[in-house]
Regions:
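Feature for secretory/organellar precursors and membrane-associated catalytic proteins
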Residues: 16-131
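Short, conserved loop/turn and helix-capping segments at secondary-structure boundaries
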Residues: 49, 156-160
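Single conserved hydrophobic/aromatic residue that forms the stacking wall/gate
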Residues: 1-12
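Active-site metal-binding motif and surrounding structural segment of the metallo-beta-lactamase
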Residues: 132-138
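Active-site environment of divalent metal-dependent phosphoester hydrolases
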Residues: 67, 148-149
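Extracytoplasmic/periplasmic terminal helices and flexible tails
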Residues: 64, 152-157, 167-187
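Phosphate/adenylate-binding glycine loop and adjacent helical scaffold
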Residues: 143
Length: 187
């Protein structure tokens, strides 16, 4: 019956349009979510080992610093100050106004030795003493694998301004060591 087959065709068209609408909404929501709420990052180097391994996949929360400032010890994703086309992952060591000193393999913040139980091995700074004063709205970043990290100590633009911090790393969802998708919080 032609009348019946036309009715079925209309039903299929409505169903397909319904699926297209659902898919379009899902794509828009996913885009907005990744653009404004979270960021996905894969760590390309060993600069944060053993906290984060080369190849680990991370989720950062973009809204983390909407109502408060980054804190010393936070692990963040940010625009590399010497080439903003690259994103880096490092630990915040110095916050605005801090005096950072590196001496005999140790980091001192405002004269106090920083407790760093996350370090892979002692830092080798060849006896060189370095001092940095962190400007307003800026941060001093170091990798946890200090002897293999391209960080604030070596950049032409030493500090990361707050507006270049993209997100606070919240958790790892893929662990390279176990080769498994697993959710673990990063501290």
């Amino acid at each position: 019956d032609p009348e019946m087959s036309r009715g079925l065709g209309d039903v299929y068209k409505r169903q397909i349009l319904s699926y297209i609408k659902i898919l379009a909404v899902a794509v828009i929501v996913a885009f907005l979510f990744t653009r404004f709420i979270i960021v996905n990052a894969q760590v390309p180097s060993g600069s944060m080992e053993n906290t984060i391994l080369t190849g680990d996949r991370l989720i950062g929360f973009r809204l983390a610093y909407l109502f408060h400032e980054p804190e010393r010890g936070d692990i963040v994703i940010f625009k590399y100050p010497d080439d903003e086309s690259q994103n880096f992952v490092k630990r915040v060591i110095g916050i605005p106004g801090d005096v950072i000193q590196i001496s005999n393999g140790h980091v001192y913040v405002n004269g106090e030795q920083l407790e760093e139980n996350y370090l892979r091995e002692p830092m080798n700074n060849d006896g060189e003493e370095l001092t940095y004063v962190v400007p307003a709205d800026s941060y001093f970043m170091l990798g946890d694998n200090r002897n293999n990290s391209k960080d604030s100590r070596y950049w032409t633009n030493t500090f990361v301004s707050k507006d270049k911090i993209i997100a606070k790393v919240s958790f790892r969802y893929f662990n390279v060591r176990t080769k498994r998708f697993t959710f673990s919080f990063i501290k």
